[in-house]
């Protein structure tokens, strides 16, 4: 069984037991979370969400992605600006997908 749910402004297609990376959630490692904004479950599409559908997950890890470097350069002006960014993420494992 698969489901598509929404969190952090993005949509994720998941199956039970799958590990996914989502935008940072303010939760501790080992805590459980339920997503009720389920867009699709095994072929039944919601308008906009499927009623009584829930995706349950457990937080595995909190971390930061690989650093990206941003360089802004103006030619002939001897101006160079460097900046780095590491996007925070939360790794989840999908425990169950249920429709009541």
UniProtKB/Swiss-Prot annotation:
What's an example Gene Ontology biological process for this entry?
translation
Instruction: Identify the domain of life.
Output: Bacteria
Q: Which residues form a coiled coil?
A: none
The record's annotation in Pfam families points to:
Ribosomal_L21p
Return one GO MF term.
structural constituent of ribosome
Q: Name one GO cellular component term.
A: ribonucleoprotein complex
UniProt entry keywords in alphabetical sequence: Ribonucleoprotein, Ribosomal protein, RNA-binding, rRNA-binding
What cystine pairs are annotated?
none
- PROSITE patterns, sorted: RIBOSOMAL_L21
* Subunit comment: Part of the 50S ribosomal subunit. Contacts protein L20.
Say what the protein does. Answer: This protein binds to 23S rRNA in the presence of protein L20.
The record's similarity note reads: Belongs to the bacterial ribosomal protein bL21 family.
Q: Which HAMAP family match?
A: Ribosomal_bL21
Could you tell me which NCBIfam families the record lists for this protein?
A: L21
Which PANTHER family does its entry note? 50S RIBOSOMAL PROTEIN L21, LARGE RIBOSOMAL SUBUNIT PROTEIN BL21M
Protein name (record):
Large ribosomal subunit protein bL21
The scientific name of the source species is Ureaplasma urealyticum serovar 10 (strain ATCC 33699 / Western)
